[in-house]
Structure formats: structure tokens, C-alpha cells
């Protein structure tokens, strides 16, 4: 199971937020992907 990405904080840089958003999206995709 992939680890949940850590929220970088309210004063994170846009780059950090973008990276977090991408990691979070991938994490959710891993969780919701059907197991065949």
C-alpha cells in the first residue's frame, strides 16, 4: 500500500503544492483502482 503524501503546509511554495497534489492524485488512484 502506498504511503499517503504529507501535506507540505499552508506556506508551502507553489511547486511543493503542485508536487503534493500530483502525489495525492496518484495515491488516490492506487487506492481506488479495482483489484483484478
Swiss-Prot record:
One GO biological process term is: feeding behavior
- Give the CC-aspect GO terms: extracellular space
Where on the chain is Tyrosine amide found, per UniProt? 36
Question: Could you tell me which InterPro entries the record lists for this protein?
Answer: Pancreatic_hormone-like (IPR001955), Pancreatic_hormone-like_CS (IPR020392)
Gene from which the chain derives:
PPY
Tell me yes or no: is Protease among this UniProt entry's keywords.
no
Secreted in keyword set: yes
> Which PROSITE patterns does this entry report, sorted A to Z?
PANCREATIC_HORMONE_1, PANCREATIC_HORMONE_2
**Localization in the cell:** Secreted
Q: Which family does it belong to?
A: Belongs to the NPY family.
Per the entry, what this protein does is: Hormone secreted by pancreatic cells that acts as a regulator of pancreatic and gastrointestinal functions probably by signaling through the G protein-coupled receptor NPY4R2.
GO terms for molecular function, please?
neuropeptide hormone activity; neuropeptide Y receptor binding
Q: What is this protein's name? A: Pancreatic polypeptide
Amino acid at each position: 500500500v502506498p504511503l499517503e503524501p504529507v501535506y507540505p503546509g499552508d506556506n508551502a511554495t507553489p511547486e511543493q503544492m503542485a508536487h503534493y497534489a500530483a502525489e495525492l492524485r496518484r495515491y488516490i488512484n492506487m487506492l481506488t483502482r479495482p483489484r483484478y
